[in-house]
Amino acid sequence: PRAITEFMVKMVNPSLKKRETVLDPACGTGGFLTATITHLEGQISKKSGAEDRKAIANCIRGIEKKQLPHLLCVTNMMLHGIDVPSMIEHRNTLTTPWNDWKRTERVNCVITNPPFGGIEDDGVGNDYHADVRTRETADMFLVLIVEKLLEDKGGRGAVVLPDGTLFGEGVKAKVKKLLMEKCQLHTIIRLPNGVFAPYTGIKTNLLFFTKGKPTDTIWFYE
């Protein structure tokens, strides 16, 4: 829903002046990225308007594994003033080998709604650390965001996640522990049932966190 995507972008508040980079590693048709473009456009200054406008294209990154959503996302970017959307990649974020993620590719902000309940193919994620090794899609995305995608100091995340990730046991508890040790998980917002179709029966949460300090206080809104 647009109201939620806009709210999440506003909370993360990427800065055009600082040329902050924003990635959605499961971008679908590009809802979070178009909301980010609109947010950044609101920061264009009169003095350096043309330069600012050009910079927006370099601030946005997206990865989508399915062909049709990828195509729609590229079209969506064009409709939002990005002439050559080369930064929208068509691949599966989770099949990139762990050590291929370079420090130089880290971003300031990750805003995403990863697929829930999916199980990745055999062999995917085998190179994750043993204690957080899983084939559950949403959990894998969260580990990757925390460990590999966000800037170490002050990288900001906003992620839609199911209850299982927050309250599950076993590997899920270890994934949550990793998040809370590496990041300041400052806000959790519980959404009413059925907000994110097609997961109508699954309780979902918005998690907002900043990397670089462990979690102390969490605001939990229900």
Across the structure, where does each feature detected by a protein language model lie?
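Conserved S-adenosyl-L-methionine
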Residues: 2-109, 117-119, 135, 139, ...
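A conserved structural/catalytic subdomain of Rossmann-like adenosyl-cofactor enzymes
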Residues: 101-222
